[in-house]
Amino acid sequence: MSDQLTPRQMFCAPVLSALLFGGGSAGISDIYVHIRDIVPLSARDWESNPLERRLARWHTSLARAINDFVRLGVVKEDGHAKWGLTEKGFAVAKEFELVSGDGVLIDRALLRKKLDEFALEFEKMYKIVTRPSAHTPSTGE
């Protein structure tokens, strides 16, 4: 896997976790630290981005994941290079058991262990958002 980019869905649960850890919002540097601690980044992820040389490729994948969350209404911009959870975002975090009903955050070790499972679920969300016309209902019934 070291020759492939980490799919952006792998960043989704850690982004929500970073925002929860920050009390509902976090700056990009805090999110970066959280991602590096949780996501097993490949050698390719650390390569320089061809379009933005000062950034690693994983920064672009992370930015796309955050933008997807903004489009979904899960995350909102909360200032310059800062994001916050919306009510919907908090509900998604609860649904994925990133936070308990009592407000206890998921343990980072458990998050690392369940990362693939979370990524698969977030992939389902993306298919709905990025391909809304993929399923055309039959009208001839």
Model-derived segments and their meaning:
Residues 81-87:
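Minor-groove-contacting beta-hairpin "wing" of winged helix-turn-helix DNA-binding domains
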Residues 28-32, 36:
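An amphipathic alpha-helix signature
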Residues 4-6, 36-63:
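Short, positively charged loop/turn segments that connect secondary-structure elements
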Residues 2-29:
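Positively charged, polyanion-binding regions of nucleic-acid-associated proteins
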Residues 88-132:
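Short, amphipathic alpha-helical interaction segments positioned at domain boundaries
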Residues 133-141:
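Solvent-exposed, charged helical/coil patches
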Residues 19-24, 37-41, 78-79:
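Short helix-capping/hinge SLiMs at alpha-helix to coil transitions
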Residues 70-80:
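A short, conserved structural fragment
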